[in-house]
Swiss-Prot record:
PROSITE patterns: IF_ROD_1, IF_ROD_2. Residues 94-125 are annotated as: Coil 1A. O-glycosylated. NF-L is the most abundant of the three neurofilament proteins and, like the other nonepithelial intermediate filament proteins, it can form homomeric 10-nm filaments. Residues 472-540 have a biased composition (Acidic residues). Keywords: Acetylation, Cell projection, Coiled coil, Cytoplasm, Cytoskeleton, Glycoprotein, Intermediate filament, Methylation, Phosphoprotein, Ubl conjugation. It is found in: Cell projection, Axon; Cytoplasm, Cytoskeleton. It comes from Bos taurus (Bovine). This is Neurofilament light polypeptide. Residues 139-234 are annotated as: Coil 1B. Residues 398-444 are annotated as: Tail, subdomain A.
């Protein structure tokens, strides 16, 4: 794995600033190695693993070179910080561009709509400007129609005048006929006087029939009253059933229309029957009065008719009873339907409550799973960092052992220069490898942190939805605040622990690299002092960057 394996993720300015710098530094180091002293001797003093011992040794002996790996580490930290800032800036720019693009699209749609409206208005205006040329033809056509109507009116007037003359002639004829009718009326009045005498004789027989008819009419009135009361009761029951259905059953089948239709049909039937009965009784009454003057056989016929009317009345009474039974059956059916719908509504309400409870349970489980997922991510990130640290330790130990074996075999200026060149080349490879190994955990750590932020946002959204669905009480609000504070404290502690682990790993790596370089380097005291100062400054920068990352995580 080379140090430039993540070049697709770096910008051009980043490559120019950070990636090309190690190449120049390594070439300068090689030139320094070429001008070093001719004799090569291995350093037999024990190597310390701390950074303070490295600094004291480099300042006292003056023969150690600056740590390439510490420079690479500072560069990787700066690269990770720049990458984070660049990614945040690019994300903000993309969001801004997306918002602007959406607003531009909306504006284009609005302008298209306005363009269509303006085109329609322009078409209407053009049609209006082209219409005056047709007005003249319309007016001329209307004038011709009016002239024809005037001619028709003149002809109609002449016809009406002729008709008037004919009506005047008819009036004169009717006046003559009226005079003749007056004479015939006088003759009829004489005959009427004679008929009145016969009418007086028939009045006695008529009185008896009238008494009988009065009794029958009283009976008819009584039956009519009973019938009207029963109809009123049926109407009241139907109206009460309709009102109760309209008030209580809003979402039930519309039976009110059916009840109204049934009520209207029976009202029409009852009115028709009453009208038919009245007309029939009136006609029979006139027939009886006329027949009473002639003979008593008509009285018997009247009795038969009365019995027939009674029979008809009984039949109508039976029909009313049947209607009443039908009404009761409909009311019973309506009540059963109401009970059934009430049961369905209660069952649906229970189902809704059950689904709401399941939704709350699912939301709480989802929040719990998200929290567990966040904890697992934190544990995974810590384990990955620890594994990377152990891997770096093992690689550094292997490199140190390989350099020790090579140093024991070198004797003389030629062999020392060859070994020195190989060690420099090996140091270059090791530095490039360690740089890639460091850049990968930093990139992975940033990726994991982004996933952690997304998980936290999802948890907060779920909690916000739960808070909207169920307003929390005071105790729950306090518990939530405590949980938030605890989560923030845990996040801060984890961030501090991660920063400390990273710093410890960096120090261990720097110490190992210093030990390896102490075995390989002897010359260049002034250059080493300057590079040591630069390494110290870069380490301070790394520490400041680690503190900034910790503060950002805390925020």
């Amino acid at each position: 794995m080379s140090s430039f394996s993540y070049e697709p993720y770096y910008s051009t300015s980043y490559k120019r600033r950070y990636v090309e710098t190690p190449r120049v530094h390594i070439s300068s180091v090689r030139s320094g190695y070429s001008t070093a002293r001719s004799a090569y001797s291995s350093y037999s003093a024990p190597v310390s693993s701390s950074l303070s011992v490295r600094r004291s040794y480099s300042s006292s002996s003056g023969s150690l070179m600056p740590s390439l790996e510490s420079l690479d580490l500072s560069q990787v930290a700066a690269i990770s910080n720049d990458l984070k800032s660049i990614r945040t800036q690019e994300k903000a720019q993309l969001q801004d561009l997306n918002d602007r693009f959406a607003s531009f699209i909306e504006r284009v749609h609005e302008l298209e709509q306005q363009n269509k409206v303006l085109e329609a208005e322009l078409l209407v205006l053009r049609q209006k400007h082209s219409e005056p040329s047709r007005f003249r033809a319309l007016y001329e056509q209307e004038i011709r129609d009016l002239r024809l109507a005037a001619e028709d009116a003149t002809n109609e007037k002449q016809a009406l005048q002729g008709e008037r003359e004919g009506l005047e002639e008819t009036l004169r004829n009717l006046q003559a006929r009226y005079e003749e009718e007056v004479l015939s009326r006088e003759d009829a009045e004489g005959r009427l006087m004679e008929a009145r005498k016969g009418a007086d004789e028939a009045a006695l027989a008529r009185a008896e029939l009238e008494k009988r008819i009065d009794s029958l009419m009283d009976e008819i009135a009584f039956l009519k009253k009973v019938h009207e009361e029963e109809i009123a009761e049926l109407q009241a029951q139907i109206q009460y059933a309709q009102i109760s259905v309209e008030m209580d059953v809003s979402s039930k089948p519309d039976l009110s229309a059916a009840l109204k239709d049934i009520r209207a049909q029976y009202e029409k039937l009852a009115a028709k029957n009453m009208q038919n009965a009245e007309e029939w009784f009136k006609s029979r009454f006139t027939v009886l009065t006329e027949s009473a003057a002639k003979n008593t056989d008509a009285v018997r016929a009247a009795k038969d008719e009365v019995s027939e009317s009674r029979r008809l009345l009984k039949a109508k009474t039976l029909e009313i009873e049947a209607c009443r039974g039908m009404n009761e059956a409909l009311e019973k059916q309506l009540q059963e339907l109401e009970d059934k719908q009430n049961a369905d509504i209660s069952a649906m309400q229970d189902t809704i409550n059950k689904l709401e409870n399941e939704l709350r349970t699912t939301k709480s489980e989802m929040a719990r799973y998200l929290k567990e997922y966040q904890d697992l991510l934190n544990v995974k990130m810590a384990l990955d960092i620890e594994i990377a640290a152990y891997r770096k330790l093992l690689e550094g130990e292997e490199t140190r052992l390989s350099f020790t074996s090579v140093g024991s075999l070198t004797t003389g200026y030629t062999q020392s220069s060859q070994v020195f060149g190989r060690s420099a080349y090996g140091g270059l490879q090791t530095s490039s490898y360690l740089m890639s190994a460091r850049s990968f955990p930093s990139y992975y750590t940033s990726h994991v942190q982004e996933e952690q932020i997304e998980v936290e946002e999802t948890i907060e959204a779920a909690k916000a939805e739960e808070a909207k669905d169920e307003p929390p009480s005071e105790g729950e609000a306090e518990e939530e605040e405590k949980e938030k504070e605890e989560a923030e404290a845990e996040a801060e502690a984890e961030a501090e622990a991660e920063a400390e682990e990273e710093e410890g790993a960096q120090e261990e790596e720097a110490a190992k690299e210093d030990a390896e370089e102490a075995k390989e380097e002897e010359g260049g005291e002034g250059e080493e002092a300057e590079e040591t100062k630069e390494a110290e400054e870069e380490e301070k920068k790394d520490e400041g960057a680690g503190e900034e990352q910790a503060t950002k995580k805390k925020d």
